[in-house]
From Swiss-Prot, chain A:
Taxon lineage: Eukaryota, Amoebozoa, Evosea, Eumycetozoa, Dictyostelia
Annotated protein name in UniProt: Putative glutathione S-transferase alpha-5
Annotated keywords: Transferase
Organism: Dictyostelium discoideum (Social amoeba)
Domain GST C-terminal: 80-198
GO molecular function: glutathione transferase activity
Curated annotation (Swiss-Prot), chain B:
GO molecular function: glutathione transferase activity
Ranges in coiled-coil conformation: none
Highest classification ranks of the organism: Eukaryota, Amoebozoa, Evosea, Eumycetozoa, Dictyostelia
Keywords, comma-separated and alphabetical: Acetylation, Transferase
Protein species of origin: Dictyostelium discoideum (Social amoeba)
Enzyme class per UniProt: transferase
GO terms under biological process: glutathione metabolic process; response to curcumin; slug development involved in sorocarp development
PANTHER family the record matches: GLUTATHIONE S-TRANSFERASE, GLUTATHIONE S-TRANSFERASE ALPHA-2-RELATED
Function: Conjugation of reduced glutathione to a wide number of exogenous and endogenous hydrophobic electrophiles.
Family, similarity comment: Belongs to the GST superfamily. Alpha family.
Name of the protein this chain belongs to: Putative glutathione S-transferase alpha-2
Catalytic activity: RX + glutathione = an S-substituted glutathione + a halide anion + H(+)
EC number assigned by the record: 2.5.1.18
GO cellular component: phagocytic vesicle
């Protein structure tokens, strides 16, 4: 079977979500790091955007679609239609958080960061995830973890790294972060990933 | 709250993000209760995972995030493509419309919107010219999403730079619009929906 390839810039950004997923699932993949989108590469991109996931002739863009595809391959999306839908509902929320942070995180000074944390547009998502985890062991509300628990870890880790963690207490999310941080599958990637501020 | 045995979709009276699932349910001929609200009351807010509408209820099963709702309904009714690969090719288009096109209305910058439309609708038009469908060899949620997105921008008028999306420039997407609007369920929905600003 062909080893999949992920193409992205040398930063964490959006690609850290599918990368963490592949690492955690133990699937070997190539990471094609690019500084710019060349004309040749642009021709392969449906919406002229990265990340791009390739597996043989199959190509897909859009981070959530890539995450879903990898998870489906590894039976990591949840057992039932309902569970899969709940997982996707959380993933959509995680992507909204990412969009809020990616847009302007690296343009903020300390004062603006503080303001963002206190009046955070992402706070409602953190509260929502925390509420689900206080009532269920996993975010998709099933009996087993799914990709979305791991994606929530990546979100918390990323937001913390950017200094944009919303004010408030999120013990369940912090515990989730600790759980995945200590995962042997992720150790190597977490230590070697780019030290970028976005 | 709805006690009906048919599913319900709760959203503001406007089209907005509720439109995708309303049109989808109408197209598939699925009876549903269309609940409209003028604001999010405290009682309603308490039932919303992220404090946002739309919300979809099917018995005890509750779902938010418009793209998740639409995908759930489409998957349940075999409208996500014929196989796994097609499902995720549909997903990448749905995600693009939700995550990239819709947020651009919040702070419209004419030059940016123009480029955005050319990039996305240009790629959809090209695909429709080449194969007749956005994914695979039959109509899917991707086609419906492009129709609803295209139609919604035109409905929003010049604030959304609607003149950029002419039938002449995008003849295949215009055909897609005709196709969906000739569907009995969609035609009935369009005829009955109220005139709103958004």
């Amino acid at each position: 079977m062909t080893k999949p390839t992920l193409t992205y810039f040398p930063v964490r950004g959006r690609v850290q979500f599918p990368r963490c997923l592949l690492e955690y699932l133990g699937e070997e993949y190539n990471f094609n790091e690019v500084k710019t989108i060349s004309d040749d590469l642009r021709k392969q991109l449906l919406f002229k955007q990265l990340p791009l996931y390739q597996e043989g002739d199959f190509k897909i863009v859009q981070t959530p679609a890539i995450i879903d595809y990898i998870s489906e391959k590894h039976d990591f999306r949840g057992k039932t239609k309902e569970e899969r839908a709940r997982a996707h509902q959380c993933l959509a929320g995680i992507m909204e958080v990412l969009d809020h942070c990616l847009g302007y995180s690296f343009k903020m000074d300390k004062q603006q960061q503080e303001k963002f944390r206190n009046e955070s547009p992402i706070k409602k998502f953190f509260e929502g995830f925390e509420m689900v985890l206080s009532q269920n062991k996993y975010l998709a509300s099933g009996e087993k973890e799914t990709y979305v628990d791991l994606m929530a870890f990546v979100m918390v880790d990323y937001v913390t790294n950017l200094g944009l963690m919303p004010s408030g207490d999120y013990p369940k999310l912090i515990s989730l972060k600790k759980h995945y941080e200590s995962s042997p599958q992720l150790k190597k990637y977490l230590e070697s990933r780019p030290q970028s501020n976005f | 709250m709805s006690t009906s045995s048919v599913p319900s979709l709760t959203y503001f009276q406007g089209r907005g993000l509720g439109q995708f699932s309303r049109v989808l349910l109408s197209y598939l001929g699925i009876p549903y209760e269309n609940i409209t609200v003028t604001e999010i009351s405290d009682a309603l807010r308490a039932t919303l995972p992220y404090g946002q509408l739309p919300i979809y209820r099917d018995g005890d099963f509750v779902l938010t995030q418009s793209s998740t709702i639409a995908r759930y309904i489409a998957k349940k009714h075999n409208f996500m493509g014929k196989n796994l690969e097609e499902e995720f090719l549909v997903d990448q288009i749905v995600t693009a419309i939700h995550a990239d096109i819709f947020p651009a209305f919040n702070n419209p910058v004419p030059e940016k919107l123009q480029k955005l439309y050319e990039k996305y609708f240009g790629s959809f038009e090209k695909k429709l010219q080449e194969t007749g469908f956005l994914v695979g060899s039959s109509v899917t949620l991707a086609d419906l999403y492009v129709y609803v997105g295209f139609d919604y921008i035109r409905f929003r008028g010049e604030a959304a730079l609607s003149s950029e999306l002419s039938d002449e420039k995008y003849p295949k997407i215009a055909e897609l619009k005709k196709f969906f609007e000739s569907n009995e369920g969609v035609a009935k929905y369009i005829k009955e929906r109220p005139e709103t600003k958004f």
